Amino acid sequence: MTYCVAITLDAGLVLTSDSRTNAGVDQVSTYSKMTRFETHADRCLVLMSAGNLATTQFVVEQIHRDIRESQARNLNTLSYLSDTADYIGEILSSRIRRYSENEASGFAPEATLLLAGQIQGGPP
């Protein structure tokens, strides 16, 4: 089970998550479930993840790739936190759809993401 918590205070945000991942019996390891994106001076965004590790790693890598390749939609070009959540949700949804087609394989690509942060001028 993964724990990700976000609390909004008058002074800002408090974010915390566990770092244990379980790939089966006796296959427990640690992996950060919190990724910080400070790629532009006017924003600080944090993505916390739970669920299938391959799915969540893909989403984080795709976000980084879109920034590196200066895609039209990336974390630096979106003006609102809600637009950023939609963008990340689209990446996640497309990945889940791609691997959910063959349910007989037993692979469960599900993941849950929690986005927190602030874009200058907007609320946290």
Task: Enumerate the predicted regions with their spans.
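Non-catalytic alpha-helical scaffolds and adjoining flexible linkers that form interface surfaces
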Residues: E101-P124
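Conserved short S/T/G-enriched processing/targeting/catalytic segments and their helical context
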Residues: M1-N102, G106
